[in-house]
Amino acid sequence: MAKIIRIKGEILGKDEPMVFTKEYNVVKEDDALETMYSEMGSKHSVKRAYINVLEVSEISEEDVQSPILKKTLEMY
């Protein structure tokens, strides 16, 4: 069964860390982490060592904040 995982973290940069929150609908928590590392590294040209994960939590459908994920969940 799929879970909704919220990942909070920061990307270390030259000036201040960039804080982010990402939400994924995945089967395993590890899949969410791998997808997040891949997306953030690709978009921001940063290596995984510069991405700090601060919190990983499973959330309910009602707690989803991402508009794209909300629309996806409404389709099912």
From Swiss-Prot:
The similarity comment for this entry is:
Belongs to the eukaryotic ribosomal protein eL20 family.
Question: A single GO CC term, please?
Answer: ribosome
Q: Name one GO biological process term.
A: translation
Question: Record's InterPro entries?
Answer: Ribosomal_eL20, Ribosomal_eL20_dom
Q: How does it assemble?
A: Part of the 50S ribosomal subunit. Binds 23S rRNA.
Provide the alphabetized UniProt keywords.
Answer: Ribonucleoprotein, Ribosomal protein, RNA-binding, rRNA-binding
Q: What is this protein called?
A: Large ribosomal subunit protein eL20
Which Pfam family is one of those matched by this entry?
Answer: Ribosomal_L18A
The answer to whether UniProt assigns keyword Ribonucleoprotein to this entry is yes
Gene3D superfamilies the record matches: 3.10.20.10
Q: Under the GO molecular function aspect, what terms does this record hold?
A: large ribosomal subunit rRNA binding; structural constituent of ribosome
Keyword field contains Calcium = no
